[in-house]
Amino acid sequence: MAKPITIKDVKTILTQPAGSRLVIVKVITSEPGLYGLGCATFTQRFHAVHAAIEKHLKPFAIGRDVSRIEEFWQMAHVHGYWRNGPVLNNAISGIDQALWDIKGKMANMPVYDLLGGKCREGAAVYRHASGPTPEAVLEKVQKFVEQGVRHIRVQMGGYGGQADSLPKPEGAPAGAYYNPREYTRRQLKMIDYVRSHVGEEVELLHDVHERLQPIDAVRFAK
């Protein structure tokens, strides 16, 4: 029986292109030149993901058979007793992706073929249009439409929306405060304004960026 290829090392690479904090995982194997890459990005808690990989998952992973991906995933998920949460899930995901990358290289096949093959030839993508007013958002949307873009995410007030000028009690911590009802009214007016000018052929998307509680999100959708 051939000797299995094992995990020799796990490296965590922190990088920040264009201001986006990314966590890249590189799994190095016992086979010279064979390695895999995965993404473990949790932008707001990248140091926590880095620690989870370096202090917990890396020692657990070294020496394991790279082909036994599901076994690693299951054991990594439960070996710490407490489980789940975005930090651990991102850390495990980065190594999991890297192991699939290795398996694809070993088979000389793209990973999607190992997972059953493609079912479509392409996927729709979107562009992001934001501005301080509905008119400013519409101006950007129209430029994208002229370029042939058909899926556009619209946001008024910049990334995550515009904070509200709410009266704060004495001692309230500094930060941005959001009135969910006002946010809903403001964004829906903007979306309606843009829709009335671009028609039904353009797909409009909106991301509330966790600004709304579930009940407010239901009202927004209705």
Label the model's feature ranges.
Residues A98-A107, L138, Q142-E146:
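Alpha-helical scaffold segments that flank or form the walls of functional sites
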Residues M1-F42:
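Structured beta-strand/loop patches that form or line metal/cofactor-binding pockets in enzymes
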Residues D9-V10, L22, P32, L37, ...:
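Ligand-binding pocket scaffold of soluble enzyme catalytic domains
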Residues E31-M106:
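Metal- or metallocofactor-binding catalytic centers and their adjacent structured scaffolds
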Residues G122-A123, R127-K222:
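Metal-dependent enolase-superfamily TIM-barrel catalytic cores that perform enediolate-based chemistry
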